[in-house]
Structures are given as structure tokens and as C-alpha cells.
Amino acid sequence: MRKLPKVAYFCMEYAIESNVKLYAGGLGILAGDYMKEACDNGYPVIGIGIKWKQGYGEQLIDKENCRPYDAYVNRYYDFLKDTGITVTVRINQRDVKVKVWQYDAHGVNNLYLLDTDVDGNDGDARWITGQLYGWFGEERVAQEMVLGIGGVRALRALGFEPDVYHFNEGHALFAGFELIREKMA
């Protein structure tokens, strides 16, 4: 039997379970199904994503005026395992600490989530992983730097050496830059 390549799968969102708000829609559903299938079949795949503090906004209807509005609530996931790993990413002239959590529930244990809401980061840095697609401009670039650069550094700290890097959409582009930086060092 041929050896399967080890794959690192980078994505901004994952839908593993509907009440775990780490996704917005189709991209997350695809990524979540991919991770679940890989885990079920024992494929050597690790997912890298973001531990969103508030996830994607929920649209609710104001009962009084019958108007829609977006609601954001802080979410806590007690099933995430602390890996004990923290990596650092330089963003806007400052070092941002990025904690690595293992998603270990709902039949998935091969997904690692990155979190900047940790002690030692200033308020702006803590909110980088606040809302999925909640900002544009510099904030979005910071989120993508955490996913890409932080993701590659997390893989190294976890001891996982992929044969293939899959970037689901352009959000993980900074992972490519980090891989180039490693080769040039």
C-alpha cells in the first residue's frame, strides 16, 4: 500500500457541529466535512483554523420593530484541549502571542485552532481572533497573518511536518510567505 502524504489544511472557518460557531457558511461546511472525513478514515491531515471568540454574527429579528440585526456573543468551548503551545507572530510592529488549542469533540481530533485572546497581548491583539469576517483592512490582514504565519509555526511546534500545504481560499496566503521565509533563513 502506498504511503499517503501528510497534509496541512488551512482554513478561516470550520463547521464541525452546528452549535459551534466557527463558520459562516459553505466554505466552513466544506472544510468541516473534509476534516471529519479525514479523521474518520485515519488520513494524515491536520487542520489549522481560528478559535473565534464570537464567531460569525447571528442575524436576529427585533420583535418590536420586526427589523433584522446582527448579534455577537462571546462563546466558550470547554471541549478544546490546551496543547500548552504558544507561538509568536509579529503584527503592526508588535509581537502577538498565539495560543494553540486542539479541537477534540464531535468525532474530530485533528483540528488545531489559533487564539490571540491570551494574557500578555494588548486589547487590539486580543481581538484579532474576535469575529469571523467582522472587519476589513488592517484587522483582516492581521487575522490572515495569524492563520498563515501562526499556523505554520504551530505545525512546527506540534512536530507535524506536512508533505502538502492546502490553503483553502486566499486567507492563508501568509503561510506561503512564512514557508518562503523558512527556506531563505
Regions found by a protein language model. Give the residues of each.
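Catalytic cores of carbohydrate-active enzymes across secretory and cytosolic contexts
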Residues: 1-185
